[in-house]
Amino acid sequence: MTDTTSSTPFVEGRAEQRLNGAIARFNRWPSAPRTVLVVASCVLGAMLLLGIISAPLDLYSQCLFAAVCFLAVLVLRKIPGRLAILALVVLSLVASLRYMFWRLTSTLGFETWVDMFFGYGLVAAEFYALIVLIFGYVQTAWPLRRTPVWLKTEPEEWPTVDVFIPTYNEALSIVKLTIFAAQAMDWPKDKLRVHVLDDGRRDDFREFCRKVGVNYIRRDNNFHAKAGNLNEALKVTDGEYIALFDADHVPTRSFLQVSLGWFLKDPKLAMLQTPHFFFSPDPFEKNLDTFRAVPNEGELFYGLVQDGNDLWNATFFCGSCAVIRREPLLEIGGVAVETVTEDAHTALKLNRLGYNTAYLAIPQAAGLATESLSRHINQRIRWARGMAQIFRTDNPLLGKGLKWGQRICYANAMLHFFYGLPRLVFLTAPLAYLIFGAEIFHASALMIVAYVLPHLVHSSLTNSRIQGRFRHSFWNEVYETVLAWYILPPVLVALVNPKAGGFNVTDKGGIIDKQFFDWKLARPYLVLLAVNLIGLGFGIHQLIWGDASTAVTVAINLTWTLYNLIITSAAVAVASEARQVRSEPRVSAKLPVSIICADGRVLDGTTQDFSQNGFGLMLSDGHSITQGERVQLVLSRNGQDSLFDARVVFSKGAQIGAQFEALSLRQQSELVRLTFSRADTWAASWGAGQPDTPLAALREVGSIGIGGLFTLGRATLHELRLALSRTPTKPLDTLMDKP
């Protein structure tokens, strides 16, 4: 476990302060008595837990026990601090383990092979979910919340840094933002070298790098994709540290000063990761119109999971927005090339050799999210395949060099991508009873409710409290439903043959000129929606005209099916691609700006948003500017003004849109320094969403699901109209009777 006292963790109250102090004193004990005490405590705790989860209770007693635990949860949720979270975790584990013990010992008396097939399939999926739940609590219950260590030495003593910007097929208009921002980082210029690693071997990139003064590196092949590109650059550079940025990840000027302090404090630190923050919406946010309103898919990982990994010294390298110490990286043979998720595998290798990895939850760079659902799915397929490859070839639960906390964190990251089959099981399990009459639970309906409800409610409320602003309840099911069908085959193939499959590059940038429904990608969601609708029909029929003695069982399965319909309908909604007409995403920001008009007037205003093509502005004092007028925009930093020629392309009262005229390379670099590279550009948006409330989140997902059904209806009508318009009509004479 990482020393929490040295990293100044976030403290929420006196109880946490006392606990942190006790942990620090305990860590100073000699190793032998400390180990004995830990082992003895674990054994006693396990015995107590086993007694609680295995205690046989009748229906009344189980309901009473569940009610008492639920009341305790309601009280604990109102208590601030992480000790209350730990108590919630304990109650959740009790409820879930009691359920699983009862499930394995009292509900598996299947009578037919159909019951056995569906019943054991569901149990296997539930067991997987329980393991992921337990490992997830270990990861996230006590995030470290590391804070920066500021550099205390003079700049002349700071280490040398090589900045690697690997690129393959990204447009120069995207990559140049990252290049300009890397050059603008606050670091001694004689100790900072920027390298563009071009696996696309493009001459215009070479010429651009020559003009702006950065090093251009290309190789003759693309062996091992990104990992091979980075390793080739390691051979021709010599900086003490390497800062890595994907081609579309634009660093702030404070990136190195915020990140390097920990390396100078901890000589065993090999890698420090910062969040991947995105200034454009991902396909879920774009297609569902939830950008900045609902936490996106990645916010849980970068907002909470990585912070939790940091407590156990198990921070993952994520391929970008990170700093690596050169010496340990060379010691493990460079960036890992055995799998397609070279980043996570590299971190695992570093941890196995005893090096530390760290996470700093302060966004110091931002990039483009995948624009379309198809690109998003392709990216997740690569991640899933790579994690399965690591699990198969370098399993963190086996081998030397890792502590148990590290093993759990790495294993859970890999097991997470195995959700494809369990998610499909959960989405179809109630249909086994409603359609086929299979008894997947060999127990009374009321006993099922008495054990299942506490398990589900406790896990939902506990995760809601832990995840807070980084993941709203029920959205995990939506994300998994969209991806489950697509990640299942590559995961299974990678487990059987880890060498199968190649590295697919995630395309970034581009426009979607019209809205359309992606019927091809939506096929799995439509199938799931259809079979659940069929199951709903069967269930309603049984509820009205079936045996009254099975009414409660039918009602339980109908409720489950209705929930699955909400989730699958939301997945259908994601498949409706919204338009994206801007080639350059706009970033919301309020910056003071002066506008010099053609007639000599100087007006004050504030930016509303910006891109590399222009500004959205709000003029002060009720002024206005005519559309089409040419102006100069003045931005200031540290008392120095920078002027940019622009033309007003939109004007409505005090609100105007200004598009830049042709800017020189120096002006483009200065614009990036004054906008994207500002130290505080992304901090205000980090974790700023509304805290999760399960009922509100259910309404949220439910409304999206209803919208998905309407979207499907409109898309179906549109396809019918197109089909009818393409139907050829026969000339009148072909319809006449012939003699």
From Swiss-Prot:
Main subcellular location of this protein, as a coarse class: membrane
Residues binding substrate, per UniProt: 246, 248
Assigned EC number: 2.4.1.12
GO CC field: plasma membrane
GO molecular function, one term: cyclic-di-GMP binding
Record has Cell inner membrane as a keyword: yes
Active site: 199, 343
Domain of life: Bacteria
Gene3D superfamilies: predicted glycosyltransferase like domains (2.40.10.220), Spore Coat Polysaccharide Biosynthesis Protein SpsA, Chain A (3.90.550.10)
Membrane topology designation: Multi-pass membrane protein
A single BP term in Gene Ontology: cellulose biosynthetic process
TM region(s), chain numbering: 36-55, 59-76, 83-101, 116-138, 417-436, 440-462, 524-546, 551-573
Subcellular location: Cell inner membrane
Segments of this protein annotated with the region Catalytic subdomain B: 327-387
Regulation: Activated by bis-(3'-5') cyclic diguanylic acid (c-di-GMP).
Catalytic activity field: [(1->4)-beta-D-glucosyl](n) + UDP-alpha-D-glucose = [(1->4)-beta-D-glucosyl](n+1) + UDP + H(+)
Domain notes: There are two conserved domains in the globular part of the protein: the N-terminal domain (domain A) contains the conserved DXD motif and is possibly involved in catalysis and substrate binding. The C-terminal domain (domain B) contains the QXXRW motif and is present only in processive glycosyl transferases. It could be involved in the processivity function of the enzyme, possibly required for holding the growing glycan chain in the active site.
Task of the protein: Catalytic subunit of cellulose synthase. It polymerizes uridine 5'-diphosphate glucose to cellulose, which is produced as an extracellular component responsible for the structural integrity and rigidity of self-supporting mats characteristic of the 'wrinkly spreader' phenotype.
Similarity comment: family membership: Belongs to the glycosyltransferase 2 family.
Full protein name: Cellulose synthase catalytic subunit [UDP-forming]
Organism from which the protein derives: Pseudomonas fluorescens (strain SBW25)
Lineage start: Bacteria, Pseudomonadati, Pseudomonadota, Gammaproteobacteria, Pseudomonadales
Gene it is expressed from: bcsA
